[in-house]
């Protein structure tokens, strides 16, 4: 064989097994004929390629040979080599001859431009599949859209995010830095340490600082005393009671706007509100929470939890702070917040609820609406677990509600601070 006629087959076989599938094969069921074999080499076939049932290797070989237009010669000068899985790389000329004899057609090979179009199409379909809603997600029904709209309207009417109507509230007796507590407050801190220890058990030591911004631009700060035995919260109790009562009234009005709530017997309305008001307020407060600073921005008022030993991370040991940070990380939308409030409100297992089955059906309706909203408005699969996370958060919120309420009741026994509305809501815990 002359040197110029020598056949160099390296370029045809070096990527044979790794050739990417650019032309999608026509898949063949193995029900009738059993295992399908390649018509060229006898290896396991994976579909029709260029008009013939072949394996991936022979498909790639034929495609490269035709596109490169290489002149192949049988190194054994016979042209009748047997092509099998083991021998298919030994004689490329006879392998190509076998491909053509089997019926593979050059005209069915896609051009480079067509290959690029196919590649782009495949990428686009994969992207659309990722962004598409999960199986079964059909979007929101008209009823679900109406439920969300009613909740959004109720939220807008009853949630004063700027606290513009929060007036005539009580402030700590000392509302500036570096000063001692008045004697009347100092005297109230002298009860038996063991009693106070029982009141504040299971709580993480922390201080609450308050900043009030005046309409004229002036700023007042309240910093609790330097000592950290837990009693520094006492001067703030009347003010915190006023803030809580203001939020409680907004939540109660929110419930009254919901038509399904108004249709319930008055006894069930009261029972549901007694059980859920605190939880719904926590959800509303979360929308105003800054995880980086641990601060709640409430219009002209700002509240900040401070670790007396320094460092914000330790505050995460407190269940309530940990909850707010965990919920904030979900980056929920307002629609999801109001649906969470509704799910919390319509809890059939609250003490005193009579029409439990009716309330249970309503809660399920709001839960399914939340699930449908997430499926049709959140990218899938990035948020495929968001609904489950939200339901887990609501379960955790029930536990926090019980813990915080019991602690407030213990404080109320020794340092009465609760408003009449708070006392009425707290009474539900005895059920």
From Swiss-Prot:
PROSITE patterns: NR_LBD (PS51843), NUCLEAR_REC_DBD_1 (PS00031), NUCLEAR_REC_DBD_2 (PS51030). Keywords: Activator, DNA-binding, Metal-binding, Nucleus, Receptor, Transcription, Transcription regulation, Zinc, Zinc-finger. GO terms for cellular component: intermediate filament cytoskeleton; nuclear body; nucleus; transcription regulator complex. Residues 38-104 bind DNA. InterPro entries: NHR-like_dom_sf (IPR035500), Nucl_hrmn_rcpt_lig-bd (IPR000536), Nuclear_hormone_rcpt_NR1 (IPR050234), Nuclear_hrmn_rcpt (IPR001723), Znf_hrmn_rcpt (IPR001628), Znf_NHR/GATA (IPR013088). Its main location: nucleus. Residues 143-430 form the NR LBD domain. Nuclear receptor that binds and is activated by a variety of endogenous and xenobiotic compounds. Transcription factor that activates the transcription of multiple genes involved in the metabolism and secretion of potentially harmful xenobiotics, endogenous compounds and drugs. Response to specific ligands is species-specific, due to differences in the ligand-binding domain. Activated by naturally occurring steroids, such as pregnenolone and progesterone. Binds to a response element in the promoters of the CYP3A4 and ABCB1/MDR1 genes. Belongs to the nuclear hormone receptor family. NR1 subfamily. Heterodimer with RXRA. Interacts with NCOA1. Interacts (via domain NR LBD) with CRY1 and CRY2 in a ligand-dependent manner. This is Nuclear receptor subfamily 1 group I member 2. It comes from Rattus norvegicus. The gene is Nr1i2.
